[in-house]
Structure formats: C-alpha cells, structure tokens
Amino acid sequence: MSHRDTLFSAPIARLGDWTFDERVAEVFPDMIQRSVPGYSNIISMIGMLAERFVQPGTQVYDLGCSLGAATLSVRRNIHHDNCKIIAIDNSPAMIERCRRHIDAYKAPTPVDVIEGDIRDIAIENASMVVLNFTLQFLEPSERQALLDKIYQGLNPGGALVLSEKFSFEDAKVGELLFNMHHDFKRANGYSELEISQKRSMLENVMLTDSVETHKARLHQAGFEHSELWFQCFNFGSLVALKAEDAA
C-alpha cells in the first residue's frame, strides 16, 4: 500500500543527500505522481512502445526499475513467446517492493528482479531497454559508457527509451519551465518547505542534461535516430533506435 508523501513537511535540521531508502519507497507512487508532470503518460506510452518493438525470443531491460511501473507496463503489452524482462535497481527497499508488485500481477512473460548496479549488468539480446528517470542519478562521466553498452546489447531494430528531467541552454526558457514545474508541485499540495527541502537533498545527486546533450551522447553511442517523443515542462522522454541493418 502506498502512503501520502509527507517526508519533508516539517523542517529537517540536517538534510544530507537524497537516497532511495525505505521511507522514500513507502511513499514513492504518491511522490512521483505529484512531482513529475506527465509521469503516468510516459509509463503507459512505454507499454505502447513495447508492443511495437519487443520481438519474440528477446529480452527487455528496465534499468533503475524503482517499484516496477515501467516493467509492468511493458509486460502488459508483450504478446510474443519466449520473452523476458530484466528489472534492476540498486535500492534494496525499492527492489523488495518491486518484487511484491510484480508478483501481484500475473502474466506469461517472466520478470527477473535484480538488486544490483546497472553499470555492472550485461545487456544481451535486447529488443528494448528502458532508462526511466535513471541516467540523471549517474555521474555525468559514467553516462556515455552506459549508453555505449546499451547500444551494443540491443539487437538491430531495437529501441532505448530515455526519460529524464532536463536542463536548458536557453536560460530564459529554463527559468520558465523550472517555475512551471514548481507551480505543478504546489498545485499538487506540496508546500514551499517541502519543495525547498527536497530540492536541497537532490541538488548534489540528480545532475540534469539538456536534450541536445542527450542526443549527442546517443549519436556517439551509435544510435542513428533519436527524438524527443514526450515533454511536459522540464521533464520528458526520448526514443533512440538502432538501425535494422546495424552490425
């Protein structure tokens, strides 16, 4: 059962850096719905993309799976035999709850839920890979290597879905979308104190990139095609395609 997010409703003397611990896992569904504009749309559309890209006898990777929302969306839309989903997260609290969520929804496609570091996982025989608000928590110097590994592990014609919070090269646009995002959180019941304290905890942990930076990395990894398919304020999602004739 999910609870309402009140983690930062009272002043916290020593905030520290953000961690996906048991307290966060307990309120995560409420937190992300009230904090990330368009999150439900992204999750449902990931399922539609899976229906288009997942092929028989292949694997799907959900890297940084949290509670398994994207995994479940993919699973509901796989209509082929001999497919498998591999869902990975490095948070024990998230993985424990993810396993419960996956087990609660029976479907023919098996799911391996793994507690581990996505940087250490081999990507093999993949028709689709999902990075749903995950890359932004890696050190910027480590992001290209992960995208390179994903590209190498994707089969020709495969797809990567990359959802992120964005920064903007145009400072005026960045300020507008930043403020609109804060308006969104206020409209969803978060106080100024809650918004401020959460931002302080995240600022050294979640380091955002521009869409242009993401596209440049994807191109360097080998993806011939990439485009922003969804955006709401400073949050969005790209899809990157490996050519069908790729070696």
From Swiss-Prot:
Catalyzes the conversion of S-adenosyl-L-methionine (SAM) to carboxy-S-adenosyl-L-methionine (Cx-SAM). It is an enzyme of class 2 (transferase). Keywords: S-adenosyl-L-methionine, Transferase. HAMAP family: Cx_SAM_synthase. Homodimer. Its EC number is 2.1.3.-. It comes from Escherichia fergusonii (strain ATCC 35469 / DSM 13698 / CCUG 18766 / IAM 14443 / JCM 21226 / LMG 7866 / NBRC 102419 / NCTC 12128 / CDC 0568-73). S-adenosyl-L-methionine binds at residues 39, 64-66, 89-90, 117-118, 132, 199. The keyword Transferase applies. Pfam families: Methyltransf_25 (PF13649). The keyword Transferase applies. Belongs to the class I-like SAM-binding methyltransferase superfamily. Cx-SAM synthase family. This is Carboxy-S-adenosyl-L-methionine synthase. One of its GO terms (biological process) is tRNA wobble uridine modification. Disulfide bonds: none annotated. InterPro entries: CmoA, Methyltransf_25, SAM-dependent_MTases_sf. It catalyses: prephenate + S-adenosyl-L-methionine = carboxy-S-adenosyl-L-methionine + 3-phenylpyruvate + H2O. One of its GO terms (molecular function) is S-adenosyl-L-methionine binding.
